[in-house]
Amino acid sequence: MLFSLTDTMDSSRLYALISRFRPSRAEIWTCRSRGTVTLSVLAFEDPNGSGNAAEEEEDERQLPSGIDFPICFLVRGRQVHLIQQIQPVQRCEHCARFYKHQHECSVRRRDFYFHHINSHSSNWWQEIHFFPIGSHPRTERLFITYDVETYTWMGAFGKQLVPFMLVMKLSGDDNLVKHALQLALELGWDQWEKDSTTFYCLTPEKMKVGQQFRTYRNRLQTSLATDLWMTFLQKNPHLSQWAQEENGLVALEDLSYEDLKRAPAIKGEPRFVELYIVGHNINGFDEIVLAAQVINNRLDVPGPFKISRNFIPRAGKILFNDITFALPNPHYKKRTNFLLWEHGGCDDQDFKYQYLKVMVRDTFALTHTSLRKAAQAYALPVEKGCCPYKAVNQFYMLGSYRADANGFPLEEYWKDKEEYLLNQELWKKKGEKNYNLIGETLNYCALDVLVTASLVEKLRSSYAQFVTDAVGLDAAHFNVFQRPTISSNSHAIFRQILYRAEKPQRTHLGPNILAPSHELYDYVRASIRGGRCYPTYIGVLKEPIYVYDICGMYASALTHPMPWGPPLNPYERALAVRQWQVALENYTCKIDYFDKNLCPGIFTIDADPPDENQLDVLPPFCSRKGGRLAWTNESLRGEVVTSVDLVTLHNRGWRLRLLSDERTTIFPTWKCLAREYVQLNIAAKERADRDKNQTLRSIAKLLSNALYGSFATKLDNKKIVFSDQMEESLMKEIAAGRLNIKSSSFIETDTLSTEVMPAFERVYSPNQLALVNSEAEESDEDQGPAPFYSPPPENCEHVTYTYKPITFMDAEEGDMCLHTLESSNPLINNDRYPSHVASFVLAWTRAFVSEWSEFLYEEDRGIPLKDRPLKSVYGDTDSLFVTEKGRRLMESQGKKRIKKYGGKLVFDPSCPELTWSVECETVCSYCGADAYSPESVFLAPKLYALKCLQCPHCGSTSKGKIRAKGHATEALSYDLMLKCYLAEAQGEDTRFSTSRLSLKRTLASAQPGAHPFTVTETTLTRTLRPWKDKTLVHLDAHRLVPYSNSQPNPRNEEVCWIEMA
């Protein structure tokens, strides 16, 4: 027998078989992964046996003659099939099915292939992870609320702010407060005489305050972690014997977390402990000043803890600085019943770990206002008076300050005379003989801490009650401090409401609301356009000006329909695009924003404006093509827009062409995603107004305004980690080239804890210390004594040499080094934010302003711009400054949009139409009627002044308004801004400027001279002058108009391809 056949065959046996038969041609079709097939061919020179196969070795045993016809094999794994016939087939580009002549592929299969199989588009849209809004009902919490006072010190990096006083207040669960209080006493903290749970540290030594606070925080989290570990051991006494038998360990603290995961039958009820470090506006100041002393997680905690850290700086502030000490949770399992999640609750099985979390939270990020205003908004008592911090600063810098005979600081240290007299009167009422500057500073700081602690408790209880009562989530156990900002909390509430309504029965929000990712993330972000802000009049205007403002513009826009459902696959998308193109080519008919035959989507377009006499000063769209955002009436090329913008442009007379782009996204339908969320907040606000509940009103207003911003959150590929936090997974990514270390920087060593060793003295011979001559480039001086060497007196034969002190820092290099890691893949991975919702929110706001422009300018169509009357002079994102003529048109043409005449705020799906309303912002302070400014001056965007407000109803005059972004407004007046404009207009060489103190915050930076974890004080001087680099065109000496095809944007140098018919 020459060859034996079996059921399975590997490649070597197949090749051996072919070599025996020696056909004229042998084809081997091999099935690979993902449906691919490779072909290999063996050709023989002579079928009668005179030649050898191309890939065959010489063999003595051969058949007398070869086979004179080709033979084909199909290899699938170890199965080999003989192919009788091969026929060419085609592959459907939409569903990947193979067919001979024709086939029918279902929509479901096309969608599945587009979203899950196609290697190019399968990662374009990702499901959004969901976890209920609530916290575990048994969570134990401890709050350390603190404030710090600083003085100015001239350091190596400029005027740095050095803490000299820190006051902290303990609150939370009684057992944790008792534990923390005992530790504070043990570590020698001073107890404030007026409150037993308030402690302070007071010393001018440069690093002492930070070191003492660091020691306390470290000892506290160490003791809490140890307590959690001891509870874990009490519930699992068998671990000691197991550790000794399996790992040979006597002390369980020597186990690692990975060892502990392998332990048998871990049991016991899990514990969840949270330690919050809280202050007001600390993330942009106090936590940076103290950060180098307190950021430490290499503690004396038991080894089995899994320690992770979330450190995220953003815009010069610490957004996250959280440390988690985790142990396994024996009750954790995959959830199958999601009813509790729908009501915002969670329990033991939802947490992979039991933990101690140490979190830094800033109440400013939850209130967006000063401490005093926040206290008023949440109905908290606030003590009168304030502290003369300028005097305190001078006292610590110079050792004294200017005072009267009783030691009370002079008027120069106070904001104004009124503040000086008030505080002097308050002090005299105390009956003290001499003014104690530091004692008063301590009292004011402690009172601020008590107010902040009251604010913390008020925020906790008020938000929990709001989520329970207004949102209807009675199982949530909501904790507002679980998330760091009001934006993240608003987004969590929105997602919870959506999850409750949709009931997806899974751990994400379902397939109908997805997050754009990779190529689609950048494409969707390109459709997000900023707000409108520019004057169309520069100079002094001596005629009435009224300011109208859209009421809750983003909230109203959020109630409108948003895209819903997974994006259409290319086949259905092409059909939907065709419907849009047909509608857009009907130039004589306007398109309804809510036409059910037209699907929502994001497109790439070219657009050409109508005749310039049909345009106005409020263009429907803006472009970044020139490098700066400009609202323009020029032709648009290659712009990414939403379907709402298509309707707005078309209805304003623009000619649009949809460009072929594989990233074009069409959604199957519309849905009012955020309408319920906005309605809840509006209802809560109205109820608060009726009940005069200032706290509820503040919460509802903040949550209503914050949601849009969360949709527009911009992600990047960067991650900042401390060197000691470089986990093995990160190291592998760096080694593989998927992550790059973009920059590394070190914390300023002066802010770290240090120990200075006593100086050493040794006697050396002068000859031993002689400086050896060296090359010029190696020495800064030609000749001189040795380093650290002072020449001895002439009659002395030896020299006493004193070393410079040796400094030992209480930190390792990993604690001091910050790495900024950046992915080598420029594409963003997004599974958190449905960014396209932000695109449509902004598109709806552009539709609002487009309708507004119709009220004002529709009657001017066909009249050249230079011949039209002045109706509006300034446009902000949600407001418009109109003249008397513009106001009359608002009262007539736009009456249904004025709130006092019944204008609506919330979109009604049963009667779909644009829904927005305005109200006059310039109102009389005496009678509340609409008022106007008789004279105004406009210098630039966000730089204008209204002289005063006159009321036509009661005839009274009230204070005007000044807007000067970036300037110290207290130094500005209407007369000064008027002089500035007139000086520029008349060619004078006078320069105007304002100055204010500014804090430069550095957390992690690769810039030279910018050192991590420093706050330096600088004087910021800004020039006050009319608009120079305008993004509009002058129509005359005062009036401006947007760019147009006759007067294009000179910055736009982009080359585009245009085919002329």
From Swiss-Prot:
The protein, known as: DNA polymerase
UniProt subcellular location: Host nucleus
Gene: POL
Region (Disordered): 773-792
Major localization class: host cell
Family according to the record: Belongs to the DNA polymerase type-B family.
Remarks, miscellaneous: This DNA polymerase requires a protein as a primer.
Top-rank lineage group of the source organism: Viruses
Self-association and partners: Heterodimer with the terminal protein; this heterodimer binds to bp 9 to 18 of the genome. Forms a complex with viral pTP, DBP and hosts NFIA and POU2F1/OCT1 for initiation of replication.
GO CC list: host cell nucleus
